[in-house]
Amino acid sequence: MLKFQSNDTTIIATFEDFILTTYVIIDELYHRFAPSEVRKRRHVLDAKLSDSEIITIALCGELVGIDSENAWFSFVKKNYRHLFPQLCSRSRFNRTRRALMQTTELLRQKLLSDFPVPISPYCIIDSFPLAVCKFGRARYCKVFRNHGADYGKCPSKKETYFGYKVHALITLEGYITAFEITPASTDDREGLRDLVDNCSNFTVLADKGYVGERLMQEMQEQNICLFALKRSNSKENWTKSVRQLIFKQRRRVETVFSQLTGQLNAERVLAKSFQGLCTRLVNKVLAYNLCIALNSIFNEPCELGKIKELIF
């Protein structure tokens, strides 16, 4: 487990401090958990940038909010060359970053289990739309259509879009413990089934999109307690106190999605391929979780979800 001593730094004063802190954590996780076939692959020692440096640059770029990969790479080259003196070409950086997608996702999983942060046994399930193009351009978007993108409806925005849906399982502290991308038309209940597969012994809070007797029975068989808000015409509804509790706790997921879509531009798709889209989403989620973890350690008076106060 990553350990913090009493003489460790407790303040991230500048963005440069944040970059260095991120690198130390990512490098530690990488050398402990990255598969040997990745760490010892051919010509890896000849690379100008290490894998840890590439992941660090990618994560910090997502947090700054510069959604253009070219613009962020140029910014690093101009302002942080002293931190990365052996900066490689932009094309090499992007190819390696995409190739490290599965490794980055593994580091995201290990961060929660290895970082000394509290995680409650209660989770919130929800989803948000991920449109890959404007609605009028949908029929020309063949690249993503070949990878399952289709039409779906977003009730909160009252619109139809073309693309995917991102399902996320979030703790009450705000950590994203699991997520997946599905076609936009996928039922939310299918997303829940996928995310809790091989899991048990925790409680899930959900909205009306996850109502269903069959789903409730399946969750009970996995020792998962599902509290989903009932529809208004339901004969058997939760008590007022339970409904208020679910409403109150579900505000957390709104905050998390607001951070992902606002600060990290999760809904703004500039990727040219499905692999690029998945890579950027994995980077955004890991960057977000890392900020929540650092806030819980360095900025105790600060709310965990206030990631802007950490990096700016």
Show the residue positions of the predicted features.
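Short alpha-helical elements
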Residues: 1-312
